[in-house]
Amino acid sequence: MSKNKLSKGQQRRVNANHQRRLKTSKEKPDYDDNLFGEPDEGIVISRFGMHADVESADGDVHRCNIRRTIRSLVTGDRVVWRPGKPAAEGVNVKGIVEAVHERTSVLTRPDFYDGVKPIAANIDQIVIVSAILPELSLNIIDRYLVACETLQIEPIIVLNKIDLLDDEGMAFVNEQMDIYRNIGYRVLMVSSHTQDGLKPLEEALTGRISIFAGQSGVGKSSLLNALLGLQKEILTNDVSDNSGLGQHTTTAARLYHFPHGGDVIDSPGVREFGLWHLEPEQITQGFVEFHDYLGLCKYRDCKHDTDPGCAIQEAVEEGKIAETRFENYHRILESMAQVKTRKNFSDTDD
């Protein structure tokens, strides 16, 4: 992280926030300001309840308390923080997060109880990791792509475990990936085991903050370990040896630095994106190849299914839109309706 001193304007905002807390709060102040040093810039590399690990400009990590006035703080947030001063007994006081800078992007997921929940901030791109094992699921890739388009965060599709493919299998997978290449998505083929294809991926990650998403068992943790040069930092028991089924391996979102440049936020919250909180129109917009045909259907309320005069259906029949993508579009809509029905039933039951 480069050294960034607070500007005079930022200093004034910190002081103004402090004075406003003193004037408006009827409660006892949450922390004594005399316990802390001068404000500085930092980035949240992990969040634990009412504490956060903040990396300072010199690369050191500081455990910090969080002001009660800060309503939302997640990994990736850029913050103003103050270090704790040594206490009388010689024990260092935790630092404190004073303010959060405006986010350039925020990654969210729906929650049945809390609505939409932020899980990471200031993400430049989402790396969608898939693999031929446990299975190559284009439906899951399409779900991630809809989420990326809705969040307006750039996606990269990475197919892992290519070392397990023979020539025939590679030809088939390339044919499947051409569906995405042809509509403008970047696709990279890699192997975390043999490290084939890692160089182009490293280049795509350099200078950016990325987050890796993928179903359990695709080797996401092993791929991150290969890129980070780690063996134990991120656990690798991605798949059960007995069942072949994926296991969850990490519990808290954390930011790591790639040795070649760039950062990654590893979070269990993005193993799968729920889309049930979206409207059907948002799902439609999430399929980028549909855009040229929207508004051209015979009927304004066209469901893009069996409706007569559907421009999207005609494009599928003419080979301009991949039939697989069109089928997955309707699968996503159907699964959304089912989840919303269960949620509404649960709410009524309460």
Curated annotation (Swiss-Prot):
What keywords is this UniProt entry annotated with?
Answer: Cytoplasm, GTP-binding, Hydrolase, Metal-binding, Nucleotide-binding, Ribosome biogenesis, RNA-binding, rRNA-binding, Zinc
> What ranges does the record list as Polar residues composition bias?
1-17
Q: EC annotation?
A: 3.6.1.-
| Cofactor or coenzyme needed | Zn(2+)
Q: Which GO terms describe its biological process?
A: ribosomal small subunit biogenesis
Database matches in PROSITE patterns: ENGC_GTPASE, G_CP
Q: What ranges does the record give for the region Disordered, renumbered to this chain?
A: 1-33
Instruction: Fetch the CDD domains from UniProt.
Output: YjeQ_EngC
Positions that bind Zn(2+): C297, C302, H304, C310
A single Gene Ontology CC annotation of this entry is:
cytoplasm
Location of the CP-type G domain: 104-273
| Cofactor: record remark | Binds 1 zinc ion per subunit.
Top class in the EC scheme: hydrolase
The terms under GO molecular function for this entry are:
GTP binding; GTPase activity; metal ion binding; rRNA binding
Q: Which domain of life is it from?
A: Bacteria
Q: Which Pfam families match?
A: RsgA_GTPase
Q: Into which family does the record put it?
A: Belongs to the TRAFAC class YlqF/YawG GTPase family. RsgA subfamily.
Q: How does it assemble?
A: Monomer. Associates with 30S ribosomal subunit, binds 16S rRNA.
Q: Which PANTHER family match?
A: SMALL RIBOSOMAL SUBUNIT BIOGENESIS GTPASE RSGA, SMALL RIBOSOMAL SUBUNIT BIOGENESIS GTPASE RSGA 1, MITOCHONDRIAL-RELATED
Function summary: One of several proteins that assist in the late maturation steps of the functional core of the 30S ribosomal subunit. Helps release RbfA from mature subunits. May play a role in the assembly of ribosomal proteins into the subunit. Circularly permuted GTPase that catalyzes slow GTP hydrolysis, GTPase activity is stimulated by the 30S ribosomal subunit.
UniProt-listed NCBIfam families: PRK12288.1, ribosome small subunit-dependent GTPase A
- Full protein name: Small ribosomal subunit biogenesis GTPase RsgA
Source organism (scientific name): Escherichia coli O8 (strain IAI1)
